[in-house]
UniProtKB/Swiss-Prot annotation:
Protein name: Fe-S cluster assembly protein DRE2
Entry keywords, A to Z: 4Fe-4S, Cytoplasm, Iron, Iron-sulfur, Metal-binding, Mitochondrion
Gene source species: Encephalitozoon cuniculi (strain GB-M1)
Annotated function: Component of the cytosolic iron-sulfur (Fe-S) protein assembly (CIA) machinery required for the maturation of extramitochondrial Fe-S proteins. Part of an electron transfer chain functioning in an early step of cytosolic Fe-S biogenesis, facilitating the de novo assembly of a [4Fe-4S] cluster on the scaffold complex CFD1-NBP35. Electrons are transferred to DRE2 from NADPH via the FAD- and FMN-containing protein TAH18.
Pfam families recorded: CIAPIN1
Compartments where located: Cytoplasm; Mitochondrion intermembrane space
Domain-related comment: The C-terminal domain binds 1 Fe-S cluster but is otherwise mostly in an intrinsically disordered conformation.
Nucleotide-binding recorded as keyword: no
Gene: DRE2
Biological process according to GO: iron-sulfur cluster assembly
Length: 112
């Protein structure tokens, strides 16, 4: 009876193992340290201010919105991913760029 159980264990272990000779050769060169899975540590998630922020986080984030690359004025092709001017057209250094959100005046002249 013990022989049958040993035979079953042996067959199960053989079924689990890969019979591909390439993987067998690759495993020979790996050490235990290589086989250990290393988890990459993620940076902590950034806190976002809520819509009706009362703790001051919204104001703090507005102050921090500055570009680290210094290429804001050149255009989107030269801007970094965290650039506050991302999506805006190129401008001269030192100029203040602002857009009117009221588009109704622009379209009224075309209809009249």
């Amino acid at each position: 009876m013990e022989d049958k159980e040993e035979l079953r264990k042996l067959l199960r272990s053989m079924m689990r193992k890969s019979t591909d000779p390439r993987t067998k050769m690759q495993d020979e060169y790996l050490t235990d340290e290589d086989k250990a899975i290393q988890r990459s540590e993620r940076p902590p998630a950034k806190k976002r201010a809520c819509k009706d922020c009362t703790c001051g986080l919204k104001e703090e984030q507005e102050v921090r919105t500055r570009s680290a690359c210094g290429n804001c004025y050149k255009g989107d092709a030269f801007r970094c991913s965290g650039c506050p001017s991302l999506g805006l057209p190129p401008y001269e250094p030192g100029d203040v760029v602002s857009f009117s959100m009221d588009l109704s005046n622009e379209f009224q002249g075309e209809d009249a």
